[in-house]
């Protein structure tokens, strides 16, 4: 579903940061200021968000992977929920340095987590002493929190979707280093540099975060559905061709 200007207004997407904290590189996206708060120009934000959704839709149709990144308190739950709904990996606890640039190390941790989960399934924890079981539980909980959202990510993602580029500077830098496209919400206090698909908007409001994440997840699901429909149509076309020439 397409996001509307009214939805953006209701979610407070237009509220930027205090004027004294602004980044001049965001000037083209600022409408003005009110009560020392910058107001973001939604006439710029809406088409830019639509462009980002279009890109995401195409990527998903081609079976691309989009990593959702949002570790701030107000975005944590929404990021996990919407990424799971779209069948995509996510990071919502803390970005571990090297998650993309040192993927080999991450793979080792993922294997450890999967082995531990398999041990739980097999009932192996029941054979452990109380102390061993406690240490095991602590380790698996820590791994699930830090990398549980990326355990099924087979490799470096095709793109990353980030809420708050300043807070996730390391993630953006790693993506830039690897040539991974960045789709990101950029507030008035940060620079849009290094972001391929800029979404100028409020990155602190939980309502605004939900709007962005839902919009990206919807685009992914639409892209996948379109790809499936195209395959079905192609198969039908082949069947009709066979019947005509039978």
From Swiss-Prot:
A biological process (GO) of this protein is: translation
Which PROSITE patterns did the record assign?
RIBOSOMAL_S2_1
> Could you name the Gene Ontology cellular component terms for this entry?
cytosolic small ribosomal subunit
Would I find Ribosomal protein among this entry's keywords?
yes
Recorded hits in Gene3D superfamilies, A to Z, give: Glucose-6-phosphate isomerase like protein, domain 1, Helix hairpin bin
Query: What InterPro entries does the entry give?
Result: Ribosomal_uS2 (IPR001865), Ribosomal_uS2_bac/mit/plastid (IPR005706), Ribosomal_uS2_CS (IPR018130), Ribosomal_uS2_flav_dom_sf (IPR023591)
Domain of life of the organism encoding this protein:
Bacteria
Kindly list the GO molecular function terms attached to this UniProt entry. Answer: structural constituent of ribosome
State whether keyword Membrane applies: no
Q: Which UniProt keywords apply?
A: Ribonucleoprotein, Ribosomal protein
PANTHER family cross-referenced by the UniProt entry? 30S RIBOSOMAL PROTEIN S2 PROKARYOTIC AND ORGANELLAR, SMALL RIBOSOMAL SUBUNIT PROTEIN US2M
Among HAMAP family, the record links this protein to: Ribosomal_uS2_B
Family label: Belongs to the universal ribosomal protein uS2 family.
What NCBIfam families does the entry give?
rpsB_bact
Name the UniProt record assigns to this protein: Small ribosomal subunit protein uS2
